[in-house]
Structures are given as structure tokens and as C-alpha cells.
Amino acid sequence: MIDDITVEELKQKIDAGEKFVFIDVREPHEYEEFNLNATLIPLGTLPSAINDLLPHKDEEIIIHCRSGARSGSAKITLTQLGFTKVRNVLGGALEWQRLYGR
């Protein structure tokens, strides 16, 4: 299993223009309040989105939520389904906002 990623590492990847699949598993109201331009797939809808994600099965997928708990669950789900490079953002959106603001 691939290591999780810190907010600082995520910001470096974004700033460098690196390619990865970026998913936000929070709820729509949380996404509207603040987001990092990730694709919104609320955790409860993740099972129905699996087919859309299958083409990215062997690509780096970075998942975040508010604090890291829901994205941790999403990482486990995708890893169990054979996705090979799934990373959870440690601290999530709260840590991003603490370090970098909105």
C-alpha cells in the first residue's frame, strides 16, 4: 500500500503541476463552503462511482475530506477493489486551511 500524503506534499504536487486524480469525499455543502478543485465524490456515493474511476486504477489517486477520516475509509475501499496508488491527505481540508488559509 502506498503512503499517505501530507498537506505540504500535496501543495508541492499541485504547485508543480503534477498529474494525479484528486477526489474530495466530503458532502456537497462542505465542498461549496471551501474546496481545493478536486472532483467531488461524497463518501456515500463512492460505490456507484467506481466504474468511472476504473480507468485510473493504476494511477495516483489522492483523496481528501475535512480531517482525513472519511478519505481514509475511501482509501481502504479503493485499495480493496484493486486500486494500487491511493493516498489519503493527512489532516484534510482543516489542515490545508490551517497552513494556507482559504
Question: What kind of feature is each model-predicted range?
Answer:
Residues 1-21, 25-60, 66-102:
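Rhodanese-like catalytic fold shared by cysteine-dependent sulfurtransferases
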